[in-house]
């Protein structure tokens, strides 16, 4: 999620995904998403399988995908973030090639909340980090 305006990283990713979807080049779309979302270590292990994945992965509704992707570029929640009063944990990744680590830092600073950055992971840290679910669970059950 980008809070205020958009940086070049998110604009390039979204523009590319919309363009590939409009062309119905789902193989390139899946490959580009994987390259931007996963760490180099993950890609090294799974890149050979991407062609297989592209045979079964594509947006179920092309127009909906495009609309949702474009909406990411116009969403501006920055001025509302300080209204969040409940305990909040923002998790980001240093190697995020979709929105960049700056988005996570900006969110946490504006909310005034806890921030955790995975150092060697990308946007899909939620899939790659072995401790991701435990980290979220521990945060949610803290103080109970």
Name the predicted role of every residue range.
Residues 7-11, 27-80:
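Conserved alpha/beta-hydrolase catalytic His-Asp/Glu region
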Residues 1-24:
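Flexible "cap/lid" loop of the alpha/beta hydrolase fold
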Residues 116:
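General small-molecule cofactor/ligand-binding pocket signal
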Residues 135-143:
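C-terminal alpha-helix
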Residues 84, 90-92, 96:
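Short beta-strand/loop motif that positions the catalytic acidic residue
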Residues 121-134:
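Catalytic histidine-centered segment of alpha/beta-hydrolase-like enzymes
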Residues 84, 110-111:
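Short, structured coil segments at secondary-structure junctions
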Residues 97-103:
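Conserved alpha/beta-hydrolase "acid-adjacent" motif
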């Amino acid at each position: 999620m980008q809070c205020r305006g958009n940086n070049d990283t998110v604009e390039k990713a979204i523009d590319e995904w919309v363009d590939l979807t409009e062309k119905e080049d789902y193989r390139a779309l899946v490959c580009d998403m994987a390259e931007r979302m996963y760490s180099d270590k993950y890609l090294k292990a799974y890149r050979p399988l991407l062609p297989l994945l592209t045979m079964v992965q594509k947006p179920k509704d092309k127009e909906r995908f495009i609309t949702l992707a474009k909406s990411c570029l116009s969403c501006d929640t920055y001025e509302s973030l300080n209204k969040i009063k409940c305990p909040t944990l923002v998790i980001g990744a240093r190697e995020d090639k979709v929105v960049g680590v700056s988005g996570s830092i900006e969110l946490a600073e504006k909310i005034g909340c806890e921030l955790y950055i995975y150092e060697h992971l990308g946007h899909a840290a939620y899939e790659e980090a072995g401790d991701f679910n435990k980290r979220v669970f521990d945060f949610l059950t803290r103080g109970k």
